[in-house]
Amino acid sequence: MAAGTLYTYPENWRAFKALIAAQYSGAQVRVLSAPPHFHFGQTNRTPEFLRKFPAGKVPAFEGDDGFCVFESNAIAYYVSNEELRGSTPEAAAQVVQWVSFADSDIVPPASTWVFPTLGIMHHNKQATENAKEEVRRILGLLDAYLKTRTFLVGERVTLADITVVCTLLWLYKQVLEPSFRQAFPNTNRWFLTCINQPQFRAVLGEVKLCEKMAQFDAKKFAETQPKKDTPRKEKGSREEKQKPQAERKEEKKAAAPAPEEEMDECEQALAAEPKAKDPFAHLPKSTFVLDEFKRKYSNEDTLSVALPYFWEHFDKDGWSLWYSEYRFPEELTQTFMSCNLITGMFQRLDKLRKNAFASVILFGTNNSSSISGVWVFRGQELAFPLSPDWQVDYESYTWRKLDPGSEETQTLVREYFSWEGAFQHVGKAFNQGKIFK
């Protein structure tokens, strides 16, 4: 039976996974989450900690036997028993399936929606609306799956349930008000069943579900940001005023910078994340302003204004055009589910919006449909390999680079951007389209 120490910061939902698993398996897990034993942002940056956990991330687990492991899913797996991991190869595969689904499909939109309401991330209206729709899709998917099931895998709680519940936790506590969640009775029933298990309650306590959807509070956001002490301006003495300007500048340079206020654990967790590098920073500047085209596309007529603007200003050296097709049309069944594939991909590519535009269309009807689209990317190569966050979906599509000067490209851009035309290359009728902008 596993025994050891879990390093984390207080109320870390990722750490909850291992702690709940330990409640089921009987693993002896001690938690160090506060000074003087563990100070997040300091202890996890010491040479001693980094020798054991090179990434410097928490949660991190150190066994009494010296075994060390980081990443919350790996820790939860280690402290689990066979029943939680899946007692057959098939059950184990399904557990991994749902654990992976939680990380890839639930975490991104949940963070985008919830973090601004906690004052730890700035609010972006469009991103939040996209996140809401993605959460709605996820809850619907779970609701359909759980219609005839008590738990996600088998008839008992597994790591699948523990992981997905913990990933949904802040959604249910912060933003899923009754009017939003009432459409998903099976998901709600399963969530409540899990959090009321003694093993869950021992870690989570009593979970109070959201009564009114929390909103972004600009004042709260400003208050949670690190501030610098700014000394009050005082009238200088006569002697001070008489000092040469150069001397006064030197004194200001020598003055120690104002110390920052100490951040709370949540802010420290975010601050500890490595600063994201711009994947397109290596590209030369371009004359084509994508945001201006997007404004034209959103507010003006597509055929008479937006498209002429696009071709007049498109920089073929700084940008590229691509045609994509979904590789597995035989797997597409209900059109609403096919549409969810597109929406899910767009959500996971949220940080690419500044450097991309696309029109992706669903053609056909239930059990006879296809998905294809035209994309605009910064640079001359596909953008997806530039960031691991963007690589979840793109391999499910074929990609063909288009020649901006060809008649075929002109036709494809016109038809896909306007959602009008013969679409002769498809062989199916237009059903609906979605714009990535």
From Swiss-Prot:
InterPro entries per the UniProt record, alphabetical: EF-GSTs, EF1B_G_C, EF1B_G_C_sf, Glutathione-S-Trfase_C-like, Glutathione-S-Trfase_C_sf, Glutathione_S-Trfase, Glutathione_S-Trfase_N, GST_C
Cellular component GO terms, alphabetical: cytoplasm; cytosol; extracellular exosome; membrane; nucleus
Domain GST N-terminal: 2-87
Record domain GST C-terminal: where: 88-216
A Pfam family matched in the record: EF1G
Gene Ontology biological process terms, A to Z: response to virus; translational elongation
Residues bearing PTM N6-acetyllysine: 147, 212, 401, 434
Superkingdom as given in the UniProt entry: Eukaryota
Modified-residue entries (N-acetylalanine), positions: 2
CDD domains listed in its UniProt record: GST_C_EF1Bgamma_like (cd03181), GST_N_EF1Bgamma (cd03044)
Tissue expression profile of the protein: Highly expressed in pancreatic tumor tissue and to a lesser extent in normal kidney, intestine, pancreas, stomach, lung, brain, spleen and liver.
Domain EF-1-gamma C-terminal per the UniProt entry, residue ranges: 276-437
Keywords recorded for this protein, A-Z: Acetylation, Elongation factor, Isopeptide bond, Protein biosynthesis, Ubl conjugation
Cross-link (Glycyl lysine isopeptide (Lys-Gly) (interchain with G-Cter in SUMO2)): 285
Listed Basic and acidic residues bias regions: 221-254
Function of the molecule: Probably plays a role in anchoring the complex to other cellular components.
Quaternary structure, from the entry: EF-1 is composed of four subunits: alpha, beta, delta, and gamma.
Full protein name: Elongation factor 1-gamma
The encoding gene: EEF1G
